[in-house]
Amino acid sequence: MTGKIVFATGNAGKMKEIRLILADLGMEIYSMKEAGIQTEVEENGTTFEENAVLKAKAIGEQTDAIVLADDSGLEVDYLNKEPGVYSARYLGEDTSYRIKNQSLIDRLDGVPEEKRTARFVCAIAAHLPDGRMLTTRGTIEGIIGYEERGEGGFGYDPIFYLPEYGCSTAELSMEKKNELSHRGKALRAMKEELKKALEA
């Protein structure tokens, strides 16, 4: 099987995380841009898994590499698990995360800590050159903070607070974030699935 993986993202932060976690597979890992693939896939699934599979399949049909795609988002329990699969599109795709984060803080104004529970969810799909599809999921539980904290991370990280660590995910070191994060968990699970699939 091919020694090449294409990850369906243009996000530099994600690529850094992915390369760190999948390094010991001993495969070359490319972003879509690096692989010269420019497909826009409409993410119209109703679950994170459906969206990841849609992306992996659409891009997998254009290359003989293994294609990994993820869909991830934030579920806030008090807001009926919003923004969920619409996390990237919440308040519009071009809206800055500073505005998105402030909106969620405002919507939880006056809500006590025990009702501010939330989780990051990440589903990853792998489309193999022989047409097989693998999926994994990872989650991390936390609460929505009262303000943005930390300069690391991206997206909703500054308002996602981990009580047991006393900080937001934007305040974690890259190593700790990879260990704890939803994407880190889903990627490590996918790494094991890929090892099994490549041996088969």
Question: Where do the language-model regions lie?
Answer:
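Anionic-ligand binding patches
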Residues: 2-6, 12-200
